[in-house]
């Protein structure tokens, strides 16, 4: 029986081969399968990866697909008791990560999704990894910088816990502790297949960004828990696939889509007002300090 299926999306080999190499030594003794979704790479990176790592399965896409759509292709054929979505711009440095995280999930049967600590390229400092569902108060606190005020995020759990001044949820210290969250990032998204089958696959209407939030929402709605486990860590080189301008616009638009699908209709116009308010604040701020960034926010305002 396959214990672990790993789904990786890639369109270039810059990080992929080092990711696959780092997996080899950590999967010894675990019945596993690696499913690589070649996202319409011009140099057919999947074919090259298959030659170097013959044990992997390759799904070739002829057109560029979104994060959720591509992962769904791998998730549909995954046979493992656990299914891991892993970014190709990651490196596995903990040799026992899979043995021990799977054991932890076996000991915690209510957990449907778990993630580990994500290290920056210095292999010391931690990145943010997920947070709490984007309710109106949380989005307001995020878009107006209110959650940067020390103590505020003790009252309002943040949508994006980030580095900041607050001693509670914001700052690297938060990501050093084991805790339950509403959602975790897709860079390392370990699912119990039983829970995945119940919650469903990614909603392919979300091309990029917020898709993990939406899927996590369905996991929790189905009664499963989501945990962040920084005892185990990987390196995430991050932001390799999408520039900041597209990322920003995708996230704001997909927050609106999330509200259309899951929240009461009266909340959407309030969300849109909050998003536009936050964007205007950034246009003013960066207009004084960094005009090129301000131009990005002007485009974002028009997009929402």
Regions from the PLM with identified roles:
Residues 12-27:
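Short, well-formed alpha-helical segments that are part of the catalytic scaffolds
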Residues 22, 38-47, 63, 91:
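A conserved acidic beta->alpha catalytic loop
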Residues 61-78, 100:
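Glycine-rich, basic loop-to-helix element that forms the pyrophosphate-binding segment
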Residues 83:
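Short aromatic/hydrophobic "clamp" motif used to bind/position activated sugar donors
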Residues 94-129:
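Conserved donor NDP-sugar-binding/catalytic core segment of glycosyltransferases
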Residues 119, 216-293:
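Active-site-adjacent helix/loop segment of glycosyltransferases
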Residues 134-181:
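Short, flexible, basic/aromatic active-site loop/helix in glycosyltransferases
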Residues 173-233:
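A short, conserved alpha-helix in the catalytic core of glycosyltransferases
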């Amino acid at each position: 029986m396959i214990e672990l299926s790993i789904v990786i999306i890639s369109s270039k080999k810059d990080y992929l081969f080092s990711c696959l190499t780092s997996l080899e030594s950590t999967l010894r003794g675990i019945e596993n399968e690696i499913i690589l979704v070649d996202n319409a790479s011009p140099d057919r990176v999947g074919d090259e990866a298959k030659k170097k790592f013959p044990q992997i399965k390759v799904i070739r896409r002829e057109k560029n697909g979104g994060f959720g759509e591509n992962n769904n292709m791998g998730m549909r054929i995954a046979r493992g008791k656990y299914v891991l979505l892993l970014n190709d711009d990651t490196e596995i440095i903990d040799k026992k990560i899979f043995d021990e995280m799977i054991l932890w999930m076996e000991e915690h049967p209510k957990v449907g999704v778990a993630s580990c600590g994500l290290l920056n390229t210095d292999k010391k400092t931690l990145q943010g990894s997920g947070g709490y569902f984007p309710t109106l108060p949380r989005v307001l606190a995020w878009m107006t910088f209110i959650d940067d005020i020390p103590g505020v995020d003790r009252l309002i759990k943040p949508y994006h816990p980030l580095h900041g001044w607050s001693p509670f949820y914001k700052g690297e210290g938060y990501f050093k502790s084991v805790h339950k969250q509403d959602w975790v990032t897709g860079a390392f998204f370990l699912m119990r297949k039983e829970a995945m089958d119940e919650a469903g696959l990614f909603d392919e209407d979300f091309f990029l960004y917020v898709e993990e939030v939406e899927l996590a929402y369905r996991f929790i709605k189905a009664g499963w828990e989501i945990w962040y486990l920084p005892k185990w860590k990987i390196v995430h080189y991050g932001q390799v696939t999408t520039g900041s301008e597209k990322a920003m616009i995708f996230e704001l638009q997909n927050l609106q889509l999330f509200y259309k699908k899951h929240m009461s209709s009266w909340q959407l116009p309030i969300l849109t007002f909050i998003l536009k308010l936050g964007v205007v604040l950034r246009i003013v701020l960066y207009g004084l300090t960094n005009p090129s960034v301000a131009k990005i926010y002007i485009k974002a305002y028009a997009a929402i």
